[in-house]
Design a protein with these regions (language model features):
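Alpha-helical interaction scaffolds
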Residues: 1-171
Length: 171
């Protein structure tokens, strides 16, 4: 709770070293973090936005230190993306009370996660392009034009995956 954003990677390193000696403690920490991420989606209070960004960054750092499996990370990313949408109707991401068309915070959360991914596994390499396409589709369902900060974040995120994996954005 009281950790500076700049020290998140250091805390992740400490937790990865602690895993050798206190597995149950580390697993409990990870489980609580996953619950906080989900609870943040349920509450959706903008006053906690920085905490939520820090939580997803911490989760990504834990993945980078191999404390979280790729499927857990991807499941969490899909949870963030799809939260509040039941998948029924003519559009997968129809605006609703939980995820309004002019709310771009989920884009910020997911960009934070994608930009901080440092470890690439074969499973992640196979499944990430589909997620990126799904994420891109989600951004198209938001009120356009996107705010400049959001556009910059998306451009940086997709540029990373164009350079690394050859991902090509839709027009």
């Amino acid at each position: 709770e009281e950790l500076s954003y700049q020290n998140i990677s250091i805390m992740s390193k400490v937790l990865s070293e602690l895993y050798k000696y206190q597995r149950n403690f580390v697993i409990t920490c990870i489980d609580e973090l996953l619950e906080k991420v989900e609870r943040g989606l349920e509450i959706n209070d903008f006053t906690h936005s920085m905490h939520r960004v820090a939580e997803v960054r911490y989760l990504t750092e834990l993945y980078s230190f191999a404390l979280i499996k790729p499927n857990v990370l991807l499941d969490t990313m899909y949870l963030i993306l799809k939260y509040g949408h039941n998948g029924k109707g003519s559009y997968l991401f129809s605006p609703n009370d939980i995820d309004e068309a002019d709310n771009y915070f989920k884009i910020q959360l997911l960009s934070t996660m994608l930009l901080n991914l440092r470890r690439n596994t074969s499973m992640l390499s196979k499944k990430l392009p589909l997620f990126l396409r799904f994420y891109e589709y989600y951004t198209f369902t938001k009120e356009q034009p996107l705010p400049q900060e959001t556009q910059f974040s998306l451009q940086t995120t997709f540029q990373k995956y164009e350079d690394e994996d050859g991902f090509e954005r839709s027009s």
